[in-house]
Amino acid sequence: MIDIFNNFYKGKRVLVTGHTGFKGSWLSIWLHELGAEVIGVAQDPFTERDNYVLSGIGNKIKADIRADIRDGKRMKEIFQEYQPEIVFHLAAQPLVRLSYDIPVETYETNVMGTINIMEAMRVSDSVKVGVMITTDKCYENKEQIWGYRENEPMGGYDPYSSSKGAAEIAIASWRRSFFNPADYGIKHHVSLASVRAGNVIGGGDWALDRIIPDCIKALEAGKPIDIRSPKAIRPWQHVLEPLSGYMLLAQKMWNEPTKYCEGWNFGPRTESITPVWDVAQDVVKYYGYGTLNDVSDPNALHEAKLLMLDISKAKFLLGWEPRMNIHQCVELTVNWYKRYHHQNVYSLCIEEINNFLEDN
């Protein structure tokens, strides 16, 4: 595999929470191929068709652990047993509409779960880098026509978005209180950052209320694709885009622990911030057939219509920027869904990672 990190991850003990999820499975595959000793901590995958299941990554990594991040005691035990050096915290309740049904569980998972991971890091002798993954929806969304910068207020209308805003506030508090850069090497040895990405797409995602899985399920069933929010504008990006940013950030934090421990946006190119309807049209184009059906409901639960990220900071300070435009993102995503039935999915994922790194 192409290694843009110059053997940095080879032999590193890397703990990934949420490794059975969509982003977590792709991150675990990438890290494993780079020679990292991956410790996965998560609950069961969502479906038997998830990327985690079909790729078999759970059988390849150092440890594949079923545990709930709401169990702080268990988290500390896992950190003590496996001695991770780098932590990527992705485990979450990730759905806006579901958060209206289970608001308390959403907060318990996204806020207290995040705090439990930071507390496990605090008592660990091994952890040097913690990258906490939240979301672009953590910002107080005014539906403005320019992107949110990292220094803008946290907020959120619905329980999911606000729980991620609250998690960001907790991360900032723990950084100041327990992982303060001014005290690095004296009172602690942890560099802690948070990262915010846009609407991530890619192969192996079957979650509810997401445009790509909804499209693929309809296409495979020979039905029209129902579009709930055709005019909603989202910052679309392929899953490998933000993951490359998270991994680059962790490398830089390891090398310069007090310089990069803050919040970071990893969003798409400006031209990839497009309406849901346009993305669905691209899915149909690259899949080869299909029809769209506008089923928008004026009385539906509130979801933000416009949300954009400013990625200037990551560009200038990390040297990271998106490699693909929206059409390339959708094409690579659809490629996975067209091939997963009849191809080794782990090999397919490796092929897509290499293509992502080679072609852009």
Regions found by a protein language model. Give the residues of each.
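N-terminal Rossmann-like NAD(P)+-binding domain of SDR-like oxidoreductases, especially those catalyzing
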Residues: 1-197, 201, 340, 356-357
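Short, solvent-exposed loop/helix junctions and linker helices
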Residues: 17, 108-111, 160, 164, ...
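C-terminal substrate-binding subdomain of Rossmann-fold SDR/epimerase-dehydratase oxidoreductases
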Residues: 31-37, 67, 199, 219-360
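Residues in well-ordered alpha-helical elements
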Residues: 72-73, 85, 97, 104, ...
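Generic structural signal for small/hydrophobic residues in well-ordered secondary structure
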Residues: 9, 19-21, 87, 117, ...
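Short aromatic-enriched loop/helix-cap "lid" or pocket-rim segments at secondary-structure transitions
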Residues: 50-53, 142-145, 205-209, 239-240, ...
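Amphipathic alpha-helical segments in well-structured domains
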Residues: 114, 208-213, 246, 280
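A short C-terminal helix-loop "cap" of Rossmann-like NAD(P)-dependent dehydrogenase/epimerase domains
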Residues: 58-59, 151-153, 177-192, 215-227, ...
